[in-house]
Amino acid sequence: MVVGPEGDFYLRPSAAPLLLVAGGSGLAPILALLEEALAAGAQRSVTLLFGAREERDLYALDEISALAAQWRASFHFVPVLSGATSDSNWQGARGLVTELIPKFLENGPHAYLCGPPVMIDSAVLMLRGSALPCDHIYADRFTPHHYPLAATA
């Protein structure tokens, strides 16, 4: 059985700052959320944490720059590489994207998470452990789906 999107990953009305955490291809829904918010005139501050393995895995950087330039409040973008070796030229954050979350919780943000299940689970545990209310945490978990293969003759 194939099930369509349920449509529960959208920006809730609020003036609270946004903490957006994306892992890998989870950036795409986060960008869609930001584009819709920008079109609606949102004026919430944004911190966007984007986790990838290597620098070559970072994508949509021009789109993120354009969004940041048009955003009506502060916009802080932090790419984080989990696979950057000490001998690489990477000057940005290293480690797991979820390890940076505690640095951005001081203003009681609403957290939107999108990416692989292990990232979502880790982020939710961290956010709940920091006393962020559960109704301020929204997640779109990427899970593998197994579809039966058509029989071949």
What is each residue range found by the language model?
Residues 1-20, 32-36, 54, 82, ...:
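FAD-binding FR-type
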Residues 10, 29, 122-123:
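Phosphate- and divalent-cation-binding pockets in alpha/beta enzyme and binding domains
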Residues 11-13, 40-42, 105:
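Short, flexible hinge/linker loops that cap or flank conserved catalytic cores
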Residues 19-22, 113:
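Catalytic cysteine-centered active loop of the rhodanese-like fold, especially the PTP/DSP P-loop
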Residues 25-30, 119:
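Hydrophobic/small residue at the entry helix of a nucleotide-binding pocket
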Residues 36-37, 127:
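Short hydrophobic alpha-helical segments of the AMP-binding
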Residues 38-39, 153:
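Rossmann-like dinucleotide/flavin-binding elements
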Residues 45, 49-153:
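Reductase modules of NAD(P)H-dependent flavoproteins
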